[in-house]
Regions:
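Conserved oxyanion/phosphate-binding beta-strand-loop segments in alpha/beta enzyme cores
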Residues: 1-6
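Gly-rich Lys/Arg/Thr-decorated short loops/hinges at beta-loop-alpha junctions or inter-strand turns
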Residues: 7-21, 39, 94-103, 123-128, ...
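Conserved N-terminal alpha-helix of the aminotransferase class I/II PLP-enzyme fold
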Residues: 12-51, 56
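PLP-dependent enzyme catalytic core of the Aspartate aminotransferase-like
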Residues: 22-36, 331-360
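Conserved PLP-enzyme active-site core in the AAT-like
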Residues: 25-28, 55-223, 307-308, 335
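Active-site C-terminal subdomain of aminotransferase-like
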Residues: 179-300
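Conserved PLP-binding catalytic core of the aspartate aminotransferase-like
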Residues: 284-319, 335-351
Length: 360
């Protein structure tokens, strides 16, 4: 149904330069999905200009930079990034002109609060964080984490790569985050493989809205138009983002509804824990506890005993006709394999995959 909606002639035959009076349906799509995702994110404004997740990160961190610059607080030159973060986080911060400060994870795989307290100061611009994090654990100290950063005058950026685990259950805005990106091409049922197209929707709190890339879609008396934020960072992509992806995402959101979105997240968590339970007696879990939507196995012991590495196992998966999982990531886990079944896999498929892992 997502593909059918995106293929409707009324959408595929649009041109971004045609008069907005003749594109009211398209603007309604942008406005409606922005409102729906704002509710899921716990944010007050959403833009679809960024073309992918890392592009969304770049946009979000530019919002943080614009906020501090606008206030004359130019001493805030550092962005804090945990050592378990996605590699795009430090790259994004550096591209935005910030110095990256890495802080270690604790023994539980979560942010080390003492290390965070030691890292923040008058030069802290913000923190970039994923929750649940890259090892599939929800950081229960998240409110304390965002408070530490806010008390130091910094802002908190939510990397929404793992939003699939918590959407409809808890909102990043309620965790204390000020801005967020979400990969529509990952979490909201749009194409993820084949090179795209992607969409890295960015949401922010009201106080950051004036820095958002313009134009934003607004509605007045049933008519849709554009509004340019007064202190906008400027465009980050031509026109209004990858619109066909937005159509697919809106179809997905409206089809599932609030309860369906929550159920999708809960099923993703259930599936990951099912596979973790089936594999934990054969493989070493990096963190042997209830996970969220993904978990990480370490093949260090297997490698020492047999010489079989994570790479070898991944190649073996190909021999069985299965795509291998993410390898050697996150970097804090040696000989890592990351397993993320998502909400759509059946028990039969997961059983088959687990059996192949164990055979290998």
């Amino acid at each position: 149904i997502d593909e059918d909606m995106a293929a409707l002639p009324g959408f595929t035959q649009l041109h971004p330069l045609q008069p907005i009076e003749t594109a009211q349906g398209a603007l309604e799509v942008l406005h409606t999905l922005g409102s729906e995702l704002g509710e899921v994110f716990g944010m007050d404004a959403v833009t679809f200009q960024p073309a992918a997740g890392a592009h969304g990160e770049f946009t979000g961190v530019l919002l943080i930079k614009a906020y501090h610059t606008d206030r004359g607080d130019t001493a805030r030159t550092k962005i804090i990034v945990p050592d378990s973060a996605h590699g795009t986080n430090p790259a994004t911060a550096a591209m935005c002109g910030f110095q990256v400060i890495n802080i270690p994870s604790g023994a539980d795989g979560c942010v080390d609060l003492d290390a965070l307290r030691a890292a923040v100061g008058p030069d802290t611009a913000g923190l970039m964080l994923t929750n649940p994090n890259t090892v599939g654990i929800f950081d229960k100290n998240i409110l304390e984490i965002t408070k530490i950063v806010h008390d130091a005058g910094g802002l908190c950026y939510y990397d929404g790569a793992n939003l699939n685990a918590v959407m409809g259950v808890v909102r990043p805005g309620d965790m204390g985050f000020d801005c967020i990106h979400s990969n529509l091409h990952k979490t909201f049922a749009t194409p993820h493989g084949g090179g795209g197209p992607g969409a890295g929707a960015v949401g922010c709190k009201e106080f950051l809205k004036k820095y958002m890339p313009g134009p934003l879609v607004v509605e007045n008396d049933g008519k849709y138009g554009f509004e340019y934020p007064e202190k906008s960072i400027g465009r980050v992509k031509m026109f209004y983002g990858n619109f066909d992806v937005v159509v697919r995402a809106l179809t997905y959101v409206l089809t599932l509804g609030k309860s369906g979105i929550r159920e999708a997240a809960m099923n993703a968590v259930l599936n990951a824990n099912y596979m973790r339970a089936k594999l934990k007696d054969t493989f070493t879990m990096a963190y042997d506890e209830i996970c969220m939507h993904e978990f990480v196995m370490s093949l260090v012991d297997l490698h020492k005993e047999t010489g079989v590495s994570a790479l070898d196992l991944a190649k073996g998966m190909l021999d069985f006709g299965l795509h291998p999982p993410t390898m050697y990531f996150p970097l804090i886990v040696h000989e890592a394999l990351m397993i993320e079944p998502c909400e759509t896999e059946s028990k039969e498929t997961m059983d088959e995959v687990c059996d192949i892992y164990c055979k290998l």
